[in-house]
Amino acid sequence: MSRMAEQQLYIHGGYTSATSGRTFETINPANGNVLATVQAAGREDVDRAVKSAQQGQKIWAAMTAMERSRILRRAVDILRERNDELAKLETLDTGKAYSETSTVDIVTGADVLEYYAGLIPALEGSQIPLRETSFVYTRREPLGVVAGIGAWNYPIQIALWKSAPALAAGNAMIFKPSEVTPLTALKLAEIYSEAGLPDGVFNVLPGVGAETGQYLTEHPGIAKVSFTGGVASGKKVMANSAASSLKEVTMELGGKSPLIVFDDADLDLAADIAMMANFFSSGQVCTNGTRVFVPAKCKAAFEQKILARVERIRAGDVFDPQTNFGPLVSFPHRDNVLRYIAKGKEEGARVLCGGDVLKGDGFDNGAWVAPTVFTDCRDEMTIVREEIFGPVMSLLTYESEDEVIRRANDTDYGLAAGIVTADLNLAHRVIHQLEAGICWINTWGESPAEMPVGGYKHSGIGRENGVMTLQSYTQVKSIQVEMAKFQSIF
């Protein structure tokens, strides 16, 4: 693909040049080619995006629920019509296999938008009787202008997960995509405008997180920040949001999730789940179950089943429909993952497979890392304690139920957890003791629009998707009505 035209900001229904004068490049990680130069938003750009959003939000909030619903449904239709086109761009920008982006990224994002478009007319208040002459009623009102800050692993899906409930509730959103993968968020802005969204209701500001993101979190005109990213960055976002104007926050942060295989489990099912929980999207999924706990007596058999499945991984041309494994999103991220792999070897974990870059035709110029499985791991190892965010599975053994629950919970993270067992009594007993916000029994990874997702502990605050997320983009106003004569003590 030839290099794209320089990408601008999207403010008030159209493209506009950044006032900062700064740019950055977005790279195709499959081959190292530059896809485009992208303009970076500065402080003045954030100011004008906020002013634009304030204007647009008033128009948007004044529309009826059905009018807003119809516009968002039109955007859903356009997304589905352009699924393949958007998926190709997402593959170029992220490196993910087209077999994945064409069936997951836009599809699941559009599903969430459709879900919230349908919920808009159901946003309602309540009536609370006090006595015969007085009652209270409540209204759910939009927050105003909110900010979304996205991560690089699911660019358009995250943009939709954040914008759908925000817009459905009558807010305007300023979205800052990751500087690593900024392209499809700009296309989403075009689609919203085409669907009839008033100018300013969805503005997109590409830029460097440490600058553009900080300007957004500190801006007094922003009422809420929804952030997806790492724990360290999330703490900064939260601190800036609180220090500036006590903004509300939603934080979807990292994870080091446990997948527990019990001794009654079908090991073929368990191995299939472990593979999806570690190597889907080349391991770049925040909910991945990278700590795989297996009964000691099942270890050897489980290792063989994992090795057999690793042989089925197909890395290569990301547009080949048979390819199911792509490069990592960037060269700096690849190098970071390789440092973790080296640390695992240094600390005594045994490499069952992988453990290096992929080499040969089609791999040498890209950010490729081989699917890697470590065994003989211990809880104190760096690869077991820290989020790697790459194709690295750690196998650990255990002897008892109480032991594995304790070890599974021995982490600062609490995003996801899963178990594989044929015993549903055991399944529910254990799941109820695991300290994680998203749990799966005999499956892994699905996060449908109806399901609230978010973490415990350092893995986040608040939830995305589900009814409660729509409500989190509103504020409740309580109004008391008195029909009798008011009595004053003065």
From Swiss-Prot:
The record marks E248 as: Seems to be a necessary countercharge to the potassium cations. The gene is betB. This is Betaine aldehyde dehydrogenase. Involved in the biosynthesis of the osmoprotectant glycine betaine. Catalyzes the irreversible oxidation of betaine aldehyde to the corresponding acid. GO terms for molecular function: betaine-aldehyde dehydrogenase (NAD+) activity; metal ion binding. The active site is at K162 (charge relay system), E252 (proton acceptor), C286 (nucleophile), E464 (charge relay system). K(+) 2 binds at L246, K457, G460. Binds 2 potassium ions per subunit. Its cofactor is K(+). It is an enzyme of class 1 (oxidoreductase). It comes from the Bacteria. NAD(+) binds at G150, A151, W152, K176, P177, S178, E179, G230, V231, A232, S233, G254, C286, E387. Pathway: Amine and polyamine biosynthesis; betaine biosynthesis via choline pathway; betaine from betaine aldehyde: step 1/1. It catalyses: betaine aldehyde + NAD(+) + H2O = glycine betaine + NADH + 2 H(+). Dimer of dimers. Its EC number is 1.2.1.8. One of its GO terms (biological process) is glycine betaine biosynthetic process from choline. PANTHER family: ALDEHYDE DEHYDROGENASE-RELATED (PTHR11699). Keywords: Metal-binding, NAD, NADP, Oxidation, Oxidoreductase, Potassium. Gene3D superfamilies: Aldehyde Dehydrogenase, Chain A, domain 1, Aldehyde Dehydrogenase, Chain A, domain 2. Pfam families: Aldedh. K(+) 1 binds at T26, I27, D93, V180. Belongs to the aldehyde dehydrogenase family. InterPro entries: Ald_DH/histidinol_DH, Ald_DH_C, Ald_DH_CS_CYS, Ald_DH_CS_GLU, Ald_DH_N, Aldehyde_DH_dom, BADH. NCBIfam families: BADH, PRK13252.1. It comes from Escherichia coli (strain SMS-3-5 / SECEC). The modification Cysteine sulfenic acid (-SOH) is found at C286.
